[in-house]
């Protein structure tokens, strides 16, 4: 029979109209969703691309006069703007590059927010310049700025330990000429901790846009020994100051403000040439110029005869600044130097090797079971891992600790200007927050050889966040304006004979005699005197010689150059054993650093005002100097207090 095929059954069934419309609607909605997602992704990509390029570097300026002071924190001013219609909110990072081998130290970060089509805005970075090459070369100071989607190579800076500028009004007419470089007044830092390189400031107007922090920074810097030149403005008159700066309105032609000096010169700064500037600033130290070199700043020109006399037979002491931070950091690091039981460790190592082979081989021969061999191997590895960890840890004393040294100079507003160096040793690896209770804190590891896994935020809300592996060290330096008046001294009696101290007694408050080291000194003019405690007072003990004799720069420089930052110092292994020995060893270098003296010529130029004496007390570090982190365990250190004490009567010259 012939089988009939049902054609209707083979034909595709037609769905109802409502079902077809529902599928179309669902497909349409899915297409809309895909389109919406693609639009969002395109928008985000466009925004990301625009924000990545939403930052232009307009200008970059080093220091106060375009240069940097080696072995100090320096100002790096960066002018940025946003030329796009999108806002920019992100971080700009400054980091020191090591040629083509990556970066060193930890990155310094500044948060920046810029409106669309913003006007140029200045951003301040505070970075540490090592400059440890011969002659304080900064050829290795290759800094790079980076942000999301962009970067900028900062020009290599030139060196000037002592910088002199005239503040210019950026909103007014610039007056070119004269011996002093111009610095826009808006760039003056709001922290005294960033003014280490500044020596002289000429002012011809009141900086009305200054913040209270900038005004305080100028007065603190002046109190610590800065020099202000009051000169005529565009109206041919001296500027008149208001508020806290009104102390500069004194009519005295050459007056004192703490250890600083205010001079009034009835002329414009643009009319002061290099020869006149050298005469005005004759008593101030000059930037070092090597043999057969000409100074970039003619103010630093030295009498060739005097220069030859100083350099003859003493060229070594006229080289690089010996008191770089790694000198102090290396000594602090050695206070937690490992003292392992190497004999036991080597014996354990030999036993471990023997148990692996032929131990495991013999075990396999005896039991002929691979599971026994694997168990023996894993057990041996686990056992000796624990043993090596325990024995290795005991070389460090198994305690987290911080060792520090600091230089502290009291300020009249109940605070102290502090330069400090610290070494943190931890037994437990983690990321640690390093912060201090103060104003204008600046951090740096001063590392010249390796990258540091951490970030640094300097200034008002300073923080050093760093990863420290277990049983290892992390060194760092910092500057801070610390709350607290420190010790207070007062002259009770004084007697002078032929311009030198014959008798002196000082009352002391705010510090216990038992917390002070046996060595204390007093500086009058260029001469040091040793002091001793007796009946609750500090009394004159003996004449210790001038600054050159006491500071012993040759020996201190040998100490500095022989000190190896990586922990091994063959020159000091036998003579220096305890932390107390190392604290004592650092006293004279700290004393030189406090005077900003690194060369014989600078020591000869040390000269305090005739109406003050400076007392140096080397004492136990109080709690307010400590890192504000309870996880860092025991903290100990020494502070060199440098206290200026007014005399009842000015000594005869």
Which functions belong to the PLM regions below?
Residues 392-413:
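Alpha-helical transmembrane signal-anchor/signal-peptide segments
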Residues 196-239, 259-265:
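Short alpha-beta junction capping motif
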Residues 371-394:
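Internal/C-terminal transmembrane anchor helices
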Residues 70-72, 131-200, 205, 260, ...:
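Aromatic-Pro/Gly-enriched surface loop or interdomain linker
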Residues 97-132, 534-551:
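Intrinsically disordered, low-complexity Pro/Gly/Ser/Thr-rich segments with frequent PxxP/GP/PP motifs
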Residues 34-46:
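Bacterial N-terminal signal peptides
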Residues 197-198, 227, 243-358:
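A glycine-centered loop/beta-turn motif at secondary-structure junctions
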Residues 420-505, 509-653:
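Accessory, solvent-exposed terminal regions and/or long lumenal/extracellular loops of proteins
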């Amino acid at each position: 029979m012939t089988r009939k095929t049902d054609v209707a059954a083979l034909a595709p069934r037609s769905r109802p109209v409502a079902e077809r419309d529902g599928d179309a609607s669902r497909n349409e909605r899915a297409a809309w969703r895909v389109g919406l997602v693609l639009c969002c992704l395109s928008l985000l990509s466009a925004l990301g691309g625009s924000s990545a390029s939403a930052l232009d570097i307009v200008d970059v300026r080093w220091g106060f006069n375009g240069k940097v002071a080696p072995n100090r924190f320096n100002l790096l001013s960066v002018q940025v703007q946003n030329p796009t219609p999108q806002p920019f909110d992100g971080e700009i990072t400054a980091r020191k590059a090591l040629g083509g081998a990556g970066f060193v130290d930890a990155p310094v970060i500044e948060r920046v927010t810029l409106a669309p089509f913003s006007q140029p805005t200045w951003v301040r970075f505070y970075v540490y310049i090592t400059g440890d090459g011969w002659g304080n070369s900064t050829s290795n100071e290759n800094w790079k700025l980076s942000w999301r989607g962009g970067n900028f190579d900062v020009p290599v800076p030139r060196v000037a330990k002592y910088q002199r500028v005239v503040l210019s009004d950026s909103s007014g007419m610039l007056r070119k000429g004269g011996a002093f470089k111009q610095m826009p007044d808006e760039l003056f830092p709001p922290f005294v901790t960033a003014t280490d390189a500044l020596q002289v400031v000429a002012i011809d107007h009141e900086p009305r846009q200054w913040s209270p922090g900038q005004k305080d920074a100028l007065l603190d810097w002046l109190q610590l020994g800065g020099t202000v030149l009051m000169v005529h403005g565009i109206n041919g008159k001296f500027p008149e100051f208001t508020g806290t700066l009104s102390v500069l309105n004194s009519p005295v032609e050459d007056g004192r403000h703490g250890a600083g000096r205010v001079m009034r010169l009835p002329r414009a700064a643009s009319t002061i040439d290099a020869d006149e500037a050298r005469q005005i600033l004759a008593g101030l130290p000059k930037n070092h110029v090597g043999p057969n070199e000409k100074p970039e700043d003619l103010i630093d020109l030295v009498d060739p005869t005097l220069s030859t006399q100083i350099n003859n037979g003493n060229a070594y002491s006229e080289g690089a600044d010996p008191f770089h931070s790694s000198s102090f950091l290396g000594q602090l690091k050695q206070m937690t130097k490992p003292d392992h039981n190497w004999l036991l460790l080597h014996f354990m190592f030999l036993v471990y090797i023997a148990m692996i082979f032929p131990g495991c081989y013999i075990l396999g021969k005896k039991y002929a079971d691979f599971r026994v061999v694997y168990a023996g191997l894993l057990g041996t590895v686990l056992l000796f891992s624990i043993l090596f960890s325990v024995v290795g840890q005991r070389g460090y004393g198994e305690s987290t600790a911080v060792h520090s040294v600091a230089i502290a100079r009291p300020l009249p507003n109940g605070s102290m200007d502090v330069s400090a160096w610290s070494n943190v040793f931890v037994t437990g690896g983690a990321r640690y927050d390093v912060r201090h209770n103060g104003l204008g804190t600046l951090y740096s590891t001063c590392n010249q050889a390796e990258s540091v896994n951490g970030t640094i935020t300097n200034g008002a809300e300073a923080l050093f966040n760093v990863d420290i592996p277990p049983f290892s060290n992390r060194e760092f330096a910092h500057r801070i304006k610390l709350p607290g008046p420190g010790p207070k001294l007062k002259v009770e009696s004084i007697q002078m004979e032929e311009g030198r101290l014959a008798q002196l007694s000082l009352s002391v408050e705010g510090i216990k005699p038992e917390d002070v080291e046996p060595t204390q000194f007093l500086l009058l003019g260029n001469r040091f005197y040793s002091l001793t405690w007796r009946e609750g007072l500090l009394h004159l003990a003996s004449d210790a010689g001038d600054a050159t004799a006491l500071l012993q720069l040759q020996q201190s420089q040998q100490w500095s150059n022989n000190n190896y930052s990586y922990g091994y110092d063959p020159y000091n292994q036998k003579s220096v054993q305890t932390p107390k020995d190392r604290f004592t060893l650092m006293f004279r270098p700290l004393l030189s650093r406090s005077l900003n003296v690194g060369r014989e010529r600078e020591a000869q130029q040390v000269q305090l005002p005739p109406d003050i004496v400076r007392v140096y007390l080397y004492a136990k570090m109080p709690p307010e100097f400590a890192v504000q982190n309870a996880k860092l365990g025991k903290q100990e250190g020494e502070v060199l207090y440098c206290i200026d004490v007014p005399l009842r009567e000015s000594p005869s010259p």
